[in-house]
């Protein structure tokens, strides 16, 4: 422990603005108490900025425990005011502004103290930012920390410092300086640059780590800037333009480090999705404000940005110059040049093509990936060579690769693919080339998701009778040999050991042993799932079908988290696996098929980023049972490059065609038109369960409401700003609408408002009553069957309700916003194809509810007709068709079947017999 003697009472003063951060506050304060420099050298000033959670209790607890902790309570003014008030209590030589949900590495203050003593003329020290919780990366600008050093911004103008929380300030240098109050975003930047414009010197300490919490519920201030409309126009005026004007007033010019920062900020803003949130008037104002920044900054400061794609930088310059910069690019010595600035070297740049899918089938090498080039497409084309034979690619267009910006789409997504025949007993080598302006250059492709190869140099992939391996800018393909595979595996494990991946090595060793011992296995393994924490969907019903069928040669498992309700409900069945266990991963790697109704990444890759090191073992067919009928345009989320489904289950010819003919990238052999397995049970129970006087209100979720699901634990997360959303306000008002409740009471109806799984943690905000209750889980089919009337917005649950031919009301109070922020409209038009009336406000909805209750919730003929036209099958043979389709039974998919009762069948049989009698 270091004991320091100085005239100030403390060496450090740490000011923490606290606002509703009770969940994290213990961790933040604990990181200060545990500093190796000694907590007696640190003063903490806790400023409670009007918190409404348990933050005050935590603050008071620490104040009672430690004399060097001060607690101040103020109304909710905002972080700037809270910090300014905190500074009036500071008695330390050096000041830090720790955010109340972040924390410090335990030795950080020790390093900072050392460098402040060494450099007595320095006023700012910057520490390295590392994200934690839902991210595990260093900050975008981490290149500044290549080494611990003193930086003069007049020379290294790209080393901009944007965070006050990860900085330490000499208290004497900030006397009389304050954070600008009322600023929602950018208060740190304005505060820091006001100091640096006077003295552009600071120290970067690589070893001192500031941990920035990237919240799973997306409720931090930085994460929510897109939601607060002040960020768009207000901060351009009061932060970016302010700094430009301040620099000009001091130096008669915009100094380079301010220009570099403005270019950095402008590119972020061009790339933002503000067009989703702003009305047309504010959108135009915002674009004009961005253009104003562009016009004040020199070109080179955009080109020198390291973290942005080249295509974005060139697009920004095209806006600035009002001309297409791409047409001004030239090729010189294999380099692409603009205005004497080298953008990239074509034969060294690794991201012209990223192969997303690499596969071998029937001695054909299939490569499919993303064309990442920013070049004018009329000027170049790709080809590859194998054994001096040239092959040219096919091009497809997937919307997932569109690059949408504030000023429109700057890159039409393009997928490139090769199909190359391989010679069985020969060593093959594939070389890749680009022809640009008639000059041929060998290029260096990269390998991404579903390529079965990681970024490590000794990564390889075994498939059929071949072994694939990257060698520099080539793809080498060898005939399979046991010894060669062993050699490659040893080299790969040595490389994994160097990066401390011992667990991955153990996993690979176990799996190799399994493969060697089961070369001639006479059975298949099928892994089946629904959501990680919830069953009762197509996965469970298909699993139950297999349990009854007991197909020979197939071992099937159902996986779900062991802390879920459904895990304990299903425990009496055989082969139930905990989705969170190591067993799940081991069985998944052994599986021939992964059959799931859930498209979450965790299902197919339960170990996150480390999954890339075992991606060569992911050889199962990936079968998507669907968690509902696809009606919207989901090309961005379910396309082949993003998901790589082997098979997708569909229920309607319209749904089938929308996937086949749209930009999903799938072919007929990837699609089955069978119906959903859960419909079997729904069809059977329809005859057994009687409808009751019951209304089900069942809306879907919204992508633009942050805090939907925890990316780590896959659970719903509480979100403070959920209660301010239009979504919450509409539905909370609806379920408590006096007119609606009076109508329901008059006709003796009860109701349930069902929360989407992504919003379960938000239940606390809703207010129920004695007529409409709020429930978390409503996917029990018995609830649907007991229900007389369904009210929904865009949830595909209405297809289930239509399947059993019951009335539906749609409420589209936020239709434009939903289409803008959630999913674009697909083939299904609610007015033309819907199974019920569409309302756009609560008045229309309540009127239709009254009509339905008055008429005993009878389905109108027009909607009954639409339902029958929509579904390919209305029977209980869906699981059977899925099973047959999976095991490659043919000639049944498009034969429309009708379900006859035994009585109807008997009548038809008698009619046929009578006709035959009279004929003869």
Please state what every model-predicted region is.
Residues 252-253, 259, 533-547, 677-765, ...:
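Conserved catalytic-core segment of nucleotide-activated headgroup transferases in glycan assembly
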Residues 1-238, 695, 800, 882:
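Nucleotide-sugar donor-binding/catalytic module of glycosyltransferases
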Residues 601, 606, 621-624, 777-822:
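A donor-sugar binding/catalytic signature common to diverse glycosyltransferases
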Residues 367, 404-406, 523-682:
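Active-site and donor-binding regions of nucleotide-sugar-utilizing enzymes
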Residues 668, 764-769, 796-871:
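Catalytic binding pocket for nucleotide-activated donors in carbohydrate/polymer assembly enzymes
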Residues 510-522, 836-920:
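C-terminal amphipathic helix plus adjacent low-complexity
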Residues 505-513, 620, 626, 632-724, ...:
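A nucleotide-sugar donor-handling region in carbohydrate enzymes
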Residues 362-591, 881, 900-918:
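N-terminal pre-catalytic "stem/leader" segment of glycosyltransferase-like enzymes
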């Amino acid at each position: 422990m270091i004991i320091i003697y100085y005239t100030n009472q403390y060496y450090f003063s740490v000011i923490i603005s606290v606002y509703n951060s009770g969940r994290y506050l213990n961790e933040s304060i604990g990181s200060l108490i545990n500093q190796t420099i000694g907590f007696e050298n640190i003063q903490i000033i806790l400023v409670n900025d009007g918190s409404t959670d348990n933050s005050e209790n935590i603050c008071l607890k620490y104040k009672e425990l430690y004399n060097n902790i001060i607690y101040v309570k103020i109304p909710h003014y905002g972080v700037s005011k809270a910090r300014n008030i905190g500074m009036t209590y500071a008695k330390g030589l050096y000041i830090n502004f720790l955010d109340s949900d972040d924390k410090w590495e335990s030795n950080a203050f020790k390093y900072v103290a050392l460098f402040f003593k060494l450099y007595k003329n320095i006023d700012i020290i910057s520490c390295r930012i590392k994200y934690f919780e839902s991210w595990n990366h260093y900050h975008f600008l981490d290149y500044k920390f290549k080494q611990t050093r003193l930086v003069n911004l007049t020379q290294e103008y790209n080393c901009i410092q944007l965070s006050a929380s990860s900085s330490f300030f000499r208290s004497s240098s900030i006397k009389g300086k304050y954070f600008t109050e009322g600023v929602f975003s950018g208060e740190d930047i304005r505060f820091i640059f006001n100091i640096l414009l006077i003295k552009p010197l600071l120290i970067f300490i690589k070893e001192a780590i500031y941990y920035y919490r990237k919240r799973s519920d997306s409720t931090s201030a930085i994460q929510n800037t897109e939601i607060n409309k002040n960020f768009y126009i207000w901060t351009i005026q009061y932060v970016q333009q302010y700094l430009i004007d301040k620099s000009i007033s001091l130096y008669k010019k915009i100094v380079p480090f301010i220009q570099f920062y403005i270019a950095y900020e402008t590119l972020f803003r061009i790339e933002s999705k503000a067009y989703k949130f702003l009305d047309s008037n504010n959108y135009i104002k915002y674009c004009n404000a961005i253009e104003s920044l562009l016009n004040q900054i020199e070109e080179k400061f955009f080109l020198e940005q390291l973290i942005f794609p080249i295509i974005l930088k060139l697009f920004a310059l095209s806006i600035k110059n009002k001309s297409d910069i791409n047409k001004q690019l030239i090729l010189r010595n294999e380099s692409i040049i603009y205005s004497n600035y080298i953008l990239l070297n074509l034969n060294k740049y690794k991201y012209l093509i990223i192969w997303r899918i690499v596969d071998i089938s029937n001695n054909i090498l299939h490569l499919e990936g993303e064309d990442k080039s920013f070049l004018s497409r009329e000027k170049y084309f790709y080809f590859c060579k194998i054994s001096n034979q040239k092959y040219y690619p096919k091009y497809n267009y997937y919307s997932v690769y569109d690059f949408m910006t504030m000023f429109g789409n700057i890159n039409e997504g393009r997928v490139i693919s090769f199909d190359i025949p391989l010679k069985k007993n020969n060593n093959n080598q594939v070389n890749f080339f680009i022809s640009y302006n008639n000059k041929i250059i060998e290029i260096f492709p990269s390998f991404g998701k579903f390529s079965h190869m990681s970024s490590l140099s000794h990564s390889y992939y075994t498939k059929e009778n071949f072994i694939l391996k990257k060698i520099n800018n080539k793809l080498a393909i060898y005939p399979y040999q046991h010894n060669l595979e062993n050699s490659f595996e040893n080299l790969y494990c040595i490389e994994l050991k160097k990066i401390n991946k011992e667990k991955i090595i153990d996993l690979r060793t176990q799996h190799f042993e399994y493969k060697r011992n089961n070369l001639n296995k006479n059975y298949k393994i099928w892994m089946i799932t629904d959501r990680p924490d919830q069953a009762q969907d197509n996965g469970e019903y298909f699993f139950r079908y297999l349990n009854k069928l007991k197909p020979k040669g197939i071992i099937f498992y159902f996986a779900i988290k062991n802390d879920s309700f459904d895990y304990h409900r299903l425990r009496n069945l055989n082969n139930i696996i905990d989705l969170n266990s190591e067993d799940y991963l081991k069985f998944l790697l052994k599986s021939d098929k992964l059959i799931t109704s859930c498209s979450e990444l965790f299902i197919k890759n339960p170990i996150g980023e480390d999954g890339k090191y075992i991606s060569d073992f992911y050889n199962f067919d990936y079968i998507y049972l669907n968690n509902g009928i696809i009606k919207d345009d989901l090309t961005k989320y379910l396309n082949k490059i993003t998901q790589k489904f082997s098979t997708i289950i569909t229920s309607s010819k319209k749904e089938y065609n929308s996937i086949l003919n749209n930009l999903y990238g799938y072919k007929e052999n990837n699609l089955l038109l069978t119906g959903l397995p859960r419909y079997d049970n729904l069809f059977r129970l329809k005859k057994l369960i009687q409808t009751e006087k019951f209304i089900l209100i069942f809306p879907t979720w919204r992508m633009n409401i942050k805090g939907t699901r925890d990316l780590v634990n896959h659970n719903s997360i509480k979100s403070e700003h959920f209660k301010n959303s239009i979504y919450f306000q509409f539905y909370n008002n609806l379920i408590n609408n006096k007119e609606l409740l009076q109508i329901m009471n008059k006709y003796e109806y009860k109701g349930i408002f069902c929360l989407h799984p992504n919003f379960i943690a938000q239940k606390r905000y809703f207010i129920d009553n004695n007529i409409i209750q709020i429930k978390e889980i409503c996917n029990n089919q018995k609830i649907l069957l007991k229900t007389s009337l369904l009210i929904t917005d865009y949830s595909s649950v209405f297809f289930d309700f239509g399947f059993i031919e019951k009335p539906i009301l749609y409420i589209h109070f936020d239709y434009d916003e939903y289409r803008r922020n959630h999913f674009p409209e697909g083939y299904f038009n609610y007015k033309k194809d819907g199974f019920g009336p569409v309302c756009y406000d609560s008045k229309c909805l309540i009127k239709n509810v009254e009509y339905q209750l008055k008429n005993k919730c009878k389905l109108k003929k027009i909607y009954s007709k639409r339902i029958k036209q929509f579904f390919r099958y209305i029977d209980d043979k869906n699981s059977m068709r899925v099973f047959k389709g999976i095991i490659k039974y043919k000639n049944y998919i498009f034969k429309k079947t009708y379900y006859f009762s035994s009585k109807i069948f008997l009548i038809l049989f008698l009619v046929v017999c009578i006709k035959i009698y009279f004929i003869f």
